[in-house]
Curated annotation (Swiss-Prot):
Species the sequence originates in: Streptomyces scabiei (strain 87.22)
Keyword Ligase: no
Domain of life: Bacteria
Cofactor: how bound: Binds 1 zinc ion per subunit.
Binding site residues for Zn(2+): H28, D31, H163
Name of the molecule in the record: 1D-myo-inositol 2-acetamido-2-deoxy-alpha-D-glucopyranoside deacetylase
Function: Catalyzes the deacetylation of 1D-myo-inositol 2-acetamido-2-deoxy-alpha-D-glucopyranoside (GlcNAc-Ins) in the mycothiol biosynthesis pathway.
EC number: 3.5.1.103
Keywords: Hydrolase, Metal-binding, Zinc
Length: 323
């Protein structure tokens, strides 16, 4: 965890970014890099405090490299600790220094896909009490005091139980953190100004897959044999539902490097990637969101998650008068 720096803004750092605090809640290691890697790298580079909370260690993931197959849950069951290290590598690539696991590393276990027996095993995140899990996140919210929260939609983007549960826990914690009557021992109340869900506009996905199909038709151009489908992309919605578009083209390399750090789960061949199913899909450097709580300035798409939220002056930071 890193405090706000005490020196002046770095060259090129917009003054308004100083004092901005972004909290992201994800289900497993790798979700943050796939969904928000460019966003995280951009805001971290611009001087915002970026905090990631990951809810499980991703113990039930499928392992891609044959040399690491022994990590799988049906063999050594050591994938979780290995993915902790992968996540640390990804955070380094994104320039993010504040990462926590919900309730501490290993407090909640990956639940596996919907309908499998792992959903109900002791400690599975899917079977956790939402208020109990949310209390762990309330502690983080009241400590970090983020103006912006990013998480999944109610379906978790694609129906994975841990993603759905992460949504429930994040939204519940956002409400409880602002309630002065809830657990005063967890810190002073804090009301998050803006809450976003991860989204991808259908038009962008269709365009990306059309480009992918053309590239697949040229032998040797793409190292993957087959394309995924639009339904394999989490959070795809009609274009009009997207309220916010973060241009991360300047951080595309950082996002790709962070995804590569999750080598047990992702294969990257820019501008495409594949998961354990080996089905290629576009790697997007521009990332999209739907504002579900908070004020939106004007009717056009936002280009900044902190739009309408002032930063703090350098003098305030030096004097210690800012939160």
């Amino acid at each position: 965890m890193t405090d706000l720096p005490s020196s002046g803004p770095r060259p090129g750092e917009p003054l308004s970014r100083v004092g901005h605090r972004l909290l992201l809640v994800h289900a497993h290691p790798d979700d943050e890099s796939i969904n928000n890697g460019a966003t995280m790298a951009k805001y971290a580079a611009e001087g915002a405090r970026v905090t990631l909370v990951t809810c499980t260690l991703g113990e039930e993931g499928e392992v891609i490299p044959p040399s690491l197959a022994h990590l799988a849950p049906d063999r050594d069951d050591t994938l979780g600790p290995y993915r902790v290290d992968e996540l640390a590598g990804a955070m380094k690539e994104l320039g993010v220094t504040d990462h926590r696991f919900l309730g501490g590393a290993g407090r909640y276990r990956d639940s596996g896909m919907m309908g499998v027996e792992q959903n109900e095993r002791p400690g599975a995140f899917w079977s956790a009490d939402v208020d109990e899990a949310a209390a762990h996140l309330v502690r983080v919210v009241r400590e970090v005091r983020p103006q912006v929260l990013v998480t999944y939609d109610p379906d978790g983007g694609y129906g994975h139980p841990d993603h759905i549960q992460a949504h429930r826990v994040a939204m519940r914690a956002a409400g409880l953190a602002a309630d002065p009557a809830f657990r005063p021992d967890l810190g002073e109340p804090w009301d998050i100004a803006k809450v976003y869900w991860n989204r991808v506009p259908r038009g962008v996905v269709l365009e990306g897959f059309e480009r992918l199909r053309r590239d697949l038709a040229e032998p040797g151009r793409v190292p993957f044999r087959q394309a995924a489908s639009v339904t394999d992309v989490p959070g795809v919605v009609d274009d009009h539902l997207v309220t916010t578009e973060i241009d991360g083209t300047g951080f595309a390399a950082a996002k790709a490097a962070a995804m590569r750090a999750h080598a047990t789960q992702i294969e990257v061949a820019e501008p495409y990637f594949a998961l354990s199913n080996a089905l290629a899909q576009p790697l997007l450097s521009t990332e999209y969101y739907e504002l579900v709580r908070g004020r939106r300035e004007g009717g056009s798409r936002e280009s900044d998650l902190f739009e309408g939220i002032p930063g703090i002056s350098f003098e305030e930071r030096q004097n210690g008068t800012a939160l």
